[in-house]
Amino acid sequence: VWPLFRAALDLFDETGDAAYRTRAEMCAYYFDSWTYRYDALYPATSDFARYGYHTRGGTAVSVQHHAIDSWGSLAAPEFVRLWRATGDARWFARARALWHNATLCIALDDKTVINGTLRPRGGQNEAFFGCRWTRYRPVEERGHFNNWLISWVNAYRLYAIHTLGFDHALFQVEENACKP
C-alpha cells in the first residue's frame, strides 16, 4: 500500500484535488491496520524485556507470519505529509510511533552481543517475534529476536531521514539503543 499512499500524496500535492488526499487517508488507514497500537507485555527473561523492545509502532510482517518488523519507517514520511495535508495530529503521532519502533535496539558500537551474535555498529534485527510459531516450541520463545541483520532496515530509516531532513521533529526521539 505504501506506493499507493505516496502516489496519492504526490497527486494531491501536484493537483490540489481533495480526492487524492482522501485516497491517501484511505491508504493510511489500511497501512495503520498493520501496525501495533500497544506495547505487549513479555516475561522479564525475554529478549524484548532484556533489551527494551516495545511493540507499539511495529508493523506486522504478514497474516501468516505474524512477526514484527520496522517496515513502517519507510512510510513515516508519508504519514508526516498526510498530517501536513489534513492538519490531523493523529497522522504525525502514527509517523512518530513508526519511527520510534524502527529505532529500537540498534547496536551503537561494535561490541554489542545478543544471543551469541556480535552486532555491527548500526545493526538491527530484521524481525522481532512476539509469539511462538507452533505448539511444539516452548512458550518462552515469545518475545525473542531473530538474528538476521540485513540492510533494508537501515535503508528505510535512511530514506526517511533523506526525505524529511535530519533535523525534522520526527527524529527527535528518546534513547532507543539496545540495552546490554
What feature does the model see in each segment?
Residues 1-180:
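Glycan-recognition and catalytic cores of secretory/periplasmic carbohydrate-active enzymes
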